[in-house]
Amino acid sequence: MGKNRKSKRQLVRDEKRAKKRGLEIEHEEERDIKKQRREEEAHQDAFAPVTDAGYVPPPLDGTYDENAFPGGPEEGRRNGPNTNFEREFFGMLAEQEQEYFRHADELLELNDFPSTEERDIFLQNVYKELRGKELKVASSQSCSRLMERLILLSNTRQKKSLFDAFGGHFISLVTHRFASHCCEKLFLQSAPVVTQELSGEYEQEPLPEGEEETEAMKSSMEDLFLLTLDELEEHLGYLLTDRFGSHAIRALLVILSGRPLDQAGTKSMLQSRKKEYITVEGAAANQSELSSQIRAVPSSFTMAIKKIIDDSTMTMDATALRVLAKHPTGNPTLQLLLELELTMFVKGKEKKEKNKQKKDDEEAEEKKEETQSEVTLLGMLVPDAPAAFADNTTQAAEFVNSMIYDPIGSRLLETLITHCPGKIFKGLQQHIFGPRIQSLLRNDIACYPAIKVLNRLSREDLADAVEKSLPEMASFVDKGRFNVIRTLFERCHIRNGTDEINALLKALTSAYGNDWKKLVPKLCMLDEDVVEEEQKPDPKFQTQEAKNKAFMLNHGCQLVAALLAIPGQPSKAIQASLAALKPAQVMKMATTSHNTSSILVKALQTPATNPTFHKVLVSSLLPHVYELATSQQGSAVLNEIISLPSKPAEPNAPAVPFHMKENIISQLANYESELRETWLGRNVWRTWKGDMWSHRRHDWVRWAKETDPETARVAAIPRKREEKEKEEAEKKPKGYLGKNFDPKKLKGFAAKKFEKKEAEA
């Protein structure tokens, strides 16, 4: 047989295709560079013209160009327009270099190396090839992902070498579309090293043969971060509103503050929802534990944060701050600056002042004058607070009122309400939020700052807010403000407001026809057609109506879960509603979405107000065991059942009868081959120990009863009658003569002995 060889025509065609593909990649990079330059030029042209006369006032209609320099036209006059630096172009990689780095990226993405030593050797070879081309690779569309993966797998010495390569070019890199992601990754991955060096736990890696040690490798990571900040310092005003640079500034602020890097709130602050998640298989195991906890940072980092806040706000006036507060890019950075100032400096000063004893009245007055003379970001946003909140014409009151209903500015207001000192919060509550709390809770934007206010209210103020909100309960339900209702219930439970909880439950039930059974079907939308999570389209292609329905379902399920966690009437109402559901509705809850299935899991974990509650809930699921086992949401409900005991340890404690567990495992055994074909089915089969059931059933029974109380695990062993009587006699108190003892029936010696004992007693 002849060998399958390509013809000459096919080889020529493949060569043409490869050249065409290479040209397309080059053209794509050129187009991206030209597009970025056009955007920069357009951004520069957006600046308001500034004359030598000084400040250019905003238009009379109250509008302001959000693309203007965040420091206002005065800063533009002093520092020049936003382009007070020249964006560098680092050149393009050759075709062979691109091919090499692309292949290295594929190998690193799989991370399928025989051992860590071979991977380290491969990384060293890549770094040798990368030497002198770091800036080109970081700013390349096709190879910047390689740089991010290299940073994930690099040791401390290699990270310091990248700081050395990027040094002097950070302002161009952090504002670049692709290189900015590499800088963020380098900052975040290097943050734990600062704490390790500070505590003395860091050990220097050995220098590879043939490599010279640079000055950056000898320097500490703290010094490298401070040098980076020095380089970015003069451009902070521009970076606050830059599309890419603002993310790098936020990352640096989080690192300097020592906050955890892996928390969900931190990640949402640092990156947008559209950001591509670059990772390496198995790289998560190499990450330091310091990323998920509060880190110790040197004092120089705290001073750097203070300097960044001062430099960022020094050249701004009230108008520029309002523009920045409503700027979609500048607002998150301003939130972080305000939060750091309030948590690290304002509250720290208050604690110190309380702990220190004032020696003289004169010294106390001098301290007050000094603190009043200091210009802070909080003081610029709400000057003369809290006294200024009493007058609606003051700058502080106007700022708060203008931000309440703004979709972007309200987020800054949430940060202010959450972290501001108690005196300022009392002024906000007394003059702005308290009198109209019920109308603010009705609004789809203002309800979020109002919820933050509810979280800080005292017992008396919360009772007043609940009293004002009770007549609006029907409106809350119609508009889908379930997050507002949930917050009211949770805060009343924390503040031990039993009367308020009962009043809220009564108002909520009346909005649904005074019937507890309607709560879960209405709040979880069981009567409406809801698309399952597996069949949902991409969020980009969802209609606004579908998105609103998803949000309402999410908030409704959160409300049900909150009511279920509150003992007393709220938990009783939700359990009664769950017990009244039809089997089809329970099955829909278990398989439709994670929000609804989590309610069933929590219901199985909650103590029952009705002894048959858990039994009724599980019996509704018994006919659909296979469907639950192969469902992503239903499998979690099924796995929760086996973790519950068969007999309750205490009255009304969660329990599922053992015969129901046997019924479920026998049904799973009938579908064993089908379950083994899917990952979810294998997970359920493993959790229920199906192999043990098939081969060693008596061991499975013993294992299934391990969750039962100690005395209820096995049946009692038959014993002799004499042993039983002996045990019963030992349990009886001394001198016990039985229930039916009658001393009048005693005769002779027994009667005399009883009389003697009675006389002695």
From Swiss-Prot:
InterPro entries according to UniProt: ARM-like, ARM-type_fold, NOP9, Pumilio_RNA-bd_rpt
Repeat (Pumilio) residue spans along the chain: 129-164, 165-200, 231-271, 395-430, 432-467, 620-666
A Pfam family: PUF_NOP9
Comp. bias intervals (Basic and acidic residues): 11-44, 350-371, 719-733
Gene giving rise to this polypeptide: NOP9
Annotated source species: Sordaria macrospora (strain ATCC MYA-333 / DSM 997 / K(L3346) / K-hell)
Function: RNA-binding nucleolar protein required for pre-rRNA processing. Involved in production of 18S rRNA and assembly of small ribosomal subunit.
GO molecular function, one term: RNA binding
Compositionally biased tracts (Basic residues): 1-10
A biological process from GO: endonucleolytic cleavage to generate mature 5'-end of SSU-rRNA from (SSU-rRNA, 5.8S rRNA, LSU-rRNA)
Span list, region Disordered: 1-56, 350-372, 712-739
Lineage top rank: taxon: Eukaryota
Similarity comment: Belongs to the NOP9 family.
Localisation: Nucleus, Nucleolus
Keywords: Nucleus, Repeat, Ribosome biogenesis, rRNA processing
Protein name: Nucleolar protein 9
GO cellular component terms listed in the entry, alphabetical order: 90S preribosome; nucleolus; preribosome, small subunit precursor
